[in-house]
């Protein structure tokens, strides 16, 4: 499960369609490599959770334009202050570690 804003692209609030929204290409490449190796990569974003706007079509096209490979793309992730999960990995930690440690999870 991978977040979008602030994880694979710059975090710009409140509008995901801001033209200054830029992909983190090296992060996308790492996730695409995992996808190519057979891992399921599901993207889940809170886009629209606060505003009620449907960002699905825009988000799908944006990820396609950035070359993102995905098993699925979902909008409507709940807004929260902290995420606690036994499989959670902070994005900065994930992108600084070797994929071998992730594959064994």
Predicted stretch roles:
Residues 1-105:
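Catalytic phosphate/metal-binding cores of nucleic-acid and nucleotide-processing enzymes, i.e., regions
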């Amino acid at each position: 499960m991978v977040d979008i804003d602030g994880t694979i692209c710059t975090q710009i609030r409140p509008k995901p369609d801001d033209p200054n929204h830029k992909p983190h290409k090296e992060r996308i490449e790492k996730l695409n490599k995992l996808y190519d190796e057979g891992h399921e990569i599901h993207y889940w974003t809170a886009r629209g959770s606060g505003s009620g706007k449907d960002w699905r079509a825009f988000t799908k096209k944006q990820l396609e334009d950035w070359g993102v490979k995905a098993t699925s793309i979902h909008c409507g992730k709940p807004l929260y202050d902290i995420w606690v999960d036994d499989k959670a990995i902070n994005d900065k930690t994930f992108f600084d570690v070797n994929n071998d440690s992730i594959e064994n999870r």
